[in-house]
Structure formats: C-alpha cells, structure tokens
Amino acid sequence: SAASDVYKRQDFDLITSTHLRGTFFCCQKIGEIMLERGYGKIINLGSTWGYTTDAKKAPYCMAKAGIAHMSRAISTEWAPNGIRINTLAPTGTVTEFTQKTWESMPERAKGILSRIKLGRFAYPSDHLGAAIFLASSASDFITGQTIYVDGGFTAAG
C-alpha cells in the first residue's frame, strides 16, 4: 500500500494485472466451455474494498470494484446462454498471509476490525455458505450480483 501520489507504476500494474486481467481471462476461458454447454456458474472473488475505500488502497479498491463491475457486464452478455456470473466479496479473512500482515501492522488490523460489526475477522469457512449457494441451483435466477460476506463491514459505510 502506498499513497496515490507516490504509487509505483510496476506495483499498480501488478495489482491490476493480477486482479482484473487475471479474472477476465479466467472468465473468458471457462466461459468458452460453459457457452458450448449452455449452462454454468462463475463466482469471481471481489472484496469489501470494491465497495468501500481506505487510504493507500486506491489501486486495490479500483481492481476489486472492477471485478464486480466486470461480472455484471459479462453476465448481461452470457445470461441468455444460461451462464450466471456473480461476485463473492469477503471482508478481512484470517489466513497465514493476513495474520503476518496484521501482526506487522496492528493499528491497521485494529482499524479494519473496528468496521466489522460482528466484532471479528472472517475465516475461510465463513465464506462457504455464500459460495455453495451461488454454485447451487438455489441461485439459478441470480446473476450479475455481488454478495458481501463481511460481518457488517459494508453496512457501516
């Protein structure tokens, strides 16, 4: 993370390439198969940062917002062919990587946690229900949506 006025081009390119370009071309590749079959479900990974913002996160916030918008855009193209595309947008989730990051930046972790109304960070298992729902026939009439699994993070603004 860096302030927008000093963000390095190579860091910007890495963030946007990984998240936007990577997601787009994954959709394109799997979409070829699904379009042939006439059915499929794609669940893209967004973030609460695609809806809200924070200092020194502009490229990441932009990329995650772009994923949600891209999912909506492609869903309008492929829905007539039976393809549903949605975005799952989690909040801060406890992983080996995030634990190390939060330990090295405790004030940052505290700030994020203060925005999660359920009072704790998510665990990967917290995202399972939404992912299973989006992958199941229970969501057959849902496309182009973003599901926030965030413990109230986005509700707080």
Tell what function each PLM region has:
Residues 2-7:
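Short, small-residue-biased leader/transition segments that mark boundaries at the very start
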Residues 8-25, 39, 43, 60, ...:
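Catalytic Tyr-X3-Lys loop
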Residues 27, 63, 71:
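Active-site helix of classical SDR
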Residues 32, 76-80, 140:
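Alpha-helical segment proximal to the catalytic Tyr-Lys
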Residues 49, 53-61, 73, 100:
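Active-site loop-to-helix junction immediately N-terminal to the catalytic Tyr of the SDR YXXXK motif
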Residues 52, 132, 143-157:
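Short C-terminal tail/terminal secondary-structure segment
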Residues 80, 92-116, 156-157:
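A glycine/serine/threonine-rich, flexible loop-to-helix segment
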Residues 116-127, 138:
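A conserved structural motif in NAD(P)-dependent oxidoreductases
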